[in-house]
Amino acid sequence: MIDHQHLRLFQFCDSQFPTGAFSHSFGLETYIQRETVHDTETFIKWLHLFINEQLTYSDGIAMRIVYHALINNDKDKILDINQKLFVQNLPKETRIGAKQMGTRMVKLALDLYDSEWIQWYYNQMKNNKIKLHPAVCFTMLGHFLGVDVESIIDYYLYQNISSLTQNAVRAIPLGQTAGQQVVTEMIAHIEKTRNHILELDEIDFGMTAPGLELNQMEHENVHVRIFIS
């Protein structure tokens, strides 16, 4: 039997969902222009690196912390990790991109659901206290829908895999079938990545591969581009 609450959260994983994810490569375009990423095999290597070395130690750990803070009604903890998500994201384009995507996701979530937590989160932004982040909003929405933290993280990882693969299909380019083969291969690694996220300590938050950040920074100087970041 289909769990409709899970489906409601999965709706936000659609690569065509209007959060602006289609406009961001998070440094992938720099690798493509250097021809470091140029086919399915090299894209999969980059995607593994991005998911395991950057997303895991930023969004992933933050989602776990936010979920437990929601259970404990710990607003200060949510504000703290939200601020850290913003300031530890050193590349300007990815930092601004996350803020824009977070703002769009929050507004869409409020248009669809009456969540007190998401409304509170939005109000913090309106009062100039924080910048909004998609990982925090996605966690709040999953919590509101009664979805367990393991599934929330799984769906968020899938969302990133799906949107980045669609962007790679356009930019490298790859065929649509090749893109679906990438997603199929990456799905097999989602559970392992999620379990790793759940095992990490909070002190691990913010660790990332310098090469990813450097290429995200260098994207600012790419003259011919199809992505904002």
Curated annotation (Swiss-Prot):
The keyword DNA-binding does not apply. It is found in: Cytoplasm. The keyword Nuclease does not apply. One of its GO terms (molecular function) is nickel cation binding. Keywords: Chaperone, Cytoplasm, Nickel insertion. One of its GO terms (cellular component) is cytoplasm. PANTHER family: UREASE ACCESSORY PROTEIN F. Required for maturation of urease via the functional incorporation of the urease nickel metallocenter. HAMAP family: UreF (MF_01385). Belongs to the UreF family. UreD, UreF and UreG form a complex that acts as a GTP-hydrolysis-dependent molecular chaperone, activating the urease apoprotein by helping to assemble the nickel containing metallocenter of UreC. The UreE protein probably delivers the nickel. This is Urease accessory protein UreF. It comes from Staphylococcus epidermidis (strain ATCC 12228 / FDA PCI 1200). The gene is ureF.
